[in-house]
Amino acid sequence: LQNQIEQNAVGHAYLFTGPRGTGKTTVARIFARAVNCERPVNGSPCGECAVCRALSEGSLDILEIDAASNNGVNEMRDLREKVQYPPVSGKYKVYIVDEVHMLTDSAFNALLKTLEEPPAHAIFILATTEPHKIPATILSRCMRLDFKLIPEEDLETHLKRILDGMGKEYEEEAVSA
């Protein structure tokens, strides 16, 4: 994802898959800010430019939809209408659809129409724990990224490295698995 931002070659649809708690939605939010950042640093948002500030304050250029509670065709038709409007402050309007596997068949069909002919300013990030429930017609239009759980030992090592680098004291038991 960082390389795509650095090379200004982002796609229009992504599918983030993996177990709960692996960072799919968090990465989607960071990516949404990074693609709109005026001065990205190594493919990450700078957090300081006007666009980054606007996005962190809740800009309309990043829209999150929880498909678990908004899973009907009307919500996807509403999305199809909204997608025509250009972004307010950034280069892209990013639509994050969390738990996309919860959409109804009719809603998937409405989403498919949007993915088939997306405006140049729109990016869709679909997140799911159950990719096998996504229709093949949707899957074929997305770049898929699989998220995996990080082993506890790796988390412990990384956390210790960060704390040591910051010069922070810690109890061994507090960072152990």
Which residues fall in each region the model found?
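Alpha-helical interaction elements
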Residues: 167
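P-loop/Walker A NTP-binding region and its immediately flanking N-terminal helices
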Residues: 1-144, 154, 160, 164, ...
